[in-house]
């Protein structure tokens, strides 16, 4: 089914029923006009309006307009705001399993991550961690593999990671710390100045088209690949549970349909624009590089250690980690048989 067909089916259900529209203010962790990430919230808002026949609309606010970007979860939990738009991995400090659900280092491709989350039991596990906070989790937007980041120093050996000051989100930060780096999480609006002034040596954020909007190519020398830390990543709509429970089951299902349609949009919208943007960066003097195999091997080994350590500390993390490993194991034979060698 196409996205329009999915949404149309939900809209037909709502047709002919006069209801009072409800508008939810949504605090985003991203700038409202940011390509792909901010854009995704607007696509979701349109899809929800169509699917519910106008019964529910979203009014999206950019990062910092309602609450600071990294306070969105606590604000939704408390009821200060009804809903938020986020990268799931931002909340790993409060919800350990969110680090894994947001992005797994050396983890699944986008299609397999979507499969695990929506059909492989992933969402049911992760939701259990959100329940004590009174928050409904709706993973509505998946990001394709990201670059490894922007650097102002070359990474030729594992030793070059020692003392590296890097902004990185999710579990990737813990992996780099294990190899001697010093990492921190900063919101998008602070990254340019931090990199320009040398407070950090490197940063990652998202896809090339998103990074372009943040101006990194103006101040960083090297653009490294691959994005080992986020082969795929999840962004979500989070809704205060009292607000969510205030919707009838029919409307909840329509919102879920709109959410899944937005996942389809995110998978379709990501691949094509990136190559042209990378060429723009090269024309500006940025050097694109791949991490050496030695460095990737060390990052993979450290990632496995971190994943196992986190699983030992948190039962829900352990449950999710076992679940995703089982899902990938079952899919491995199929995917390996279907893989076509590159020329």
Predicted feature locations:
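N-terminal secretory/targeting leader peptides
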Residues: 21-113, 123-343
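Cleavable N-terminal signal peptides
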Residues: 8-9, 19
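Bacterial N-terminal signal peptides that target proteins for export
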Residues: 1-7
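Sec/Tat signal peptide C-region and signal peptidase I cleavage site
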Residues: 15-21
């Amino acid at each position: 089914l196409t996205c329009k067909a999915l949404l149309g089916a939900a809209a037909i259900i709502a047709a002919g029923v006069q209801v009072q529209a409800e508008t939810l203010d949504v605090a985003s962790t991203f700038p409202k006009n940011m390509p792909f990430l901010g854009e995704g919230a607007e696509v979701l808002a349109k899809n929800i309006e169509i699917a519910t026949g106008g019964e529910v609309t979203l009014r999206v606010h950019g990062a910092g307009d309602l609450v600071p970007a990294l306070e969105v979860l606590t604000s939704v939990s408390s009821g200060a705001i009804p809903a938020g738009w986020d990268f799931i991995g931002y909340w790993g400090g409060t919800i350990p399993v969110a680090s894994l659900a947001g992005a797994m280092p050396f983890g699944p491709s986008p299609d397999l991550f979507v499969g695990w989350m929506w059909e492989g039991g992933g969402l049911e596990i992760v939701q259990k961690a959100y329940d004590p906070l009174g928050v409904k989790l709706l993973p509505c937007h998946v990001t394709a593999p990201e670059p490894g980041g922007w650097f102002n120093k070359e990474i030729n050996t594992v030793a070059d990671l020692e003392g590296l000051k890097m902004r990185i989100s999710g579990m990737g930060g813990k992996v780099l710390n294990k190899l001697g780096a010093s990492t921190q999480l900063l919101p998008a609006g602070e990254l340019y100045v931090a990199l320009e002034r040398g407070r950090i040596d490197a940063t990652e954020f998202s896809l090339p088209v998103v990074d372009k909007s943040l101006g990194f190519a103006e101040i960083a020398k090297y653009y490294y690949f691959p994005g080992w830390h986020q082969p795929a990543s999840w962004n979500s709509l989070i809704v205060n549970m009292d607000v969510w429970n205030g919707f009838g089951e029919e409307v909840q299902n329509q919102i879920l349909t709109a959410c899944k349609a937005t996942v389809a949009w995110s998978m379709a919208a990501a691949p094509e624009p990136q190559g042209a943007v990378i060429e723009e960066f090269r024309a500006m003097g940025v050097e694109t590089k791949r991490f050496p195999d030695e460095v990737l091997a060390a990052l993979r080994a450290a990632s496995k250690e971190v994943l196992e350590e986190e699983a030992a500390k948190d039962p829900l993390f352990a449950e999710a980690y076992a679940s995703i490993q089982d899902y990938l194991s079952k899919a491995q034979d199929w995917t390996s048989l279907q893989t076509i060698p590159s020329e």
